[in-house]
Design a protein with these regions (language model features):
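Membrane-interface helix-loop junctions and terminal tails of multi-pass membrane proteins
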Residues: 1-124
């Protein structure tokens, strides 16, 4: 008999994968532009390209992770849903959990996705 995922398990898996991919993309953009500037000796990039690269990394990471684990626009209610997501940083998730703005039940899979995504993004 094939085990079935519950609705909560499916949501947790989606949030985990969203944080993993979003953090991975953030680190790929950021570390990639720093490596380009450093390895070229400043000929192919400087402080401006590094800052733009990190900014684009945050933008793309939030665009990837936000719709899955973040605030979504609800056309029926004409308001944002109350879910918080697209942290892309373990310090953000942990500090929000400490001030009780983020559920402790979601903290483990958010942190796991962020750490694994950061490892993969910096490795690539």
């Amino acid at each position: 008999m094939k085990p079935k995922l519950s609705a909560r398990s499916f949501v947790m898996l989606n949030e985990f994968l969203a944080e993993l991919v979003g953090t991975c993309v953030l680190l790929m953009f950021g570390c990639g532009c720093v490596a380009q500037a450093v390895l070229s000796g400043g000929a192919n990039g400087g402080m401006l390209s590094i800052n733009i690269g990190w900014g684009l990394g945050v933008l793309v990471g939030v665009l990837i992770a936000g719709p899955v684990s973040g605030k979504q626009w609800s056309s029926k209610l004409n308001q944002y849903s109350p879910f918080v997501g697209a942290h892309l940083n373990p310090a953000v998730s942990l500090s929000l959990a400490c001030v009780r703005k983020f559920p402790l039940t979601s903290l483990a899979h958010y942190l796991a996705g962020q750490y694994l995504g950061a490892f993969l993004g910096s490795s690539i």
